[in-house]
Amino acid sequence: MDMIKLISVNNDGLKNEALNIYLKNDYYFSKISDNLPSISAVEEDIKTIPNGVQKNQKNYRLISFNDEILGVVDFLTDYPEKDTILIGLFIIKNDKQKQGLGTKIFRYLEKSFKNKKFLKIRIGVLVDNEIGLSFWKKQNFKEIERKFLKFEKSKKEVIVMEKEI
């Protein structure tokens, strides 16, 4: 039986683990920045929350699969509306992709959110993130709108997708 754990990132060692995940996912980060991710990018991701969101709604976690740290998930509860989860980041190391692990981990998260009585999950995917779009479509997410969001490089078109759970 697969064992999945979400680990709170609350010390420098765990921040370095998160950075390691970022560095091993160059496909995604090349879409949003010309620079390699740094520890300050990790720290920024850990603390950044939209206006009006409480700190207890923010969940930035390492993903451990059978005792191996291989991903990061960052999500907000009850955002942008009550009973909705917004996943802001879900990445798996490049060398661990295409093995069904992302799907197993997402199903674990989905079940956990459903058990906590959330009704839907929302995500935003860069238009040019073909790997991400393919993954989320396989998880039965449907496009609800498109918008432009500011990233380090520039404004980028994002496809907002949603799934009822």
Q: How would you describe each model-predicted region?
A:
Residues D2-K5:
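Extreme N-terminal starter segment of soluble prokaryotic enzymes
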Residues S8-D95, F106-Y108, S112, K147, ...:
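Acetyl-CoA-dependent GNAT
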Residues K58, K156-M161:
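Short hydrophobic/aromatic beta-strand or adjacent loop that forms the aromatic wall/cage
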Residues K93-D95, Q99, V127-D128:
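Active-site acidic-Proline motif in GNAT/NAT acetyltransferases
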Residues T103:
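Residues forming the Rossmann-fold NAD(P)(H) cofactor-binding site
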Residues F113-G124:
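Conserved GNAT acetyl-CoA-binding A-motif
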Residues G124-L126, K137-V158:
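Conserved catalytic-core motifs of GNAT/GCN5-like acyltransferases
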Residues G132:
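Helix-turn-helix
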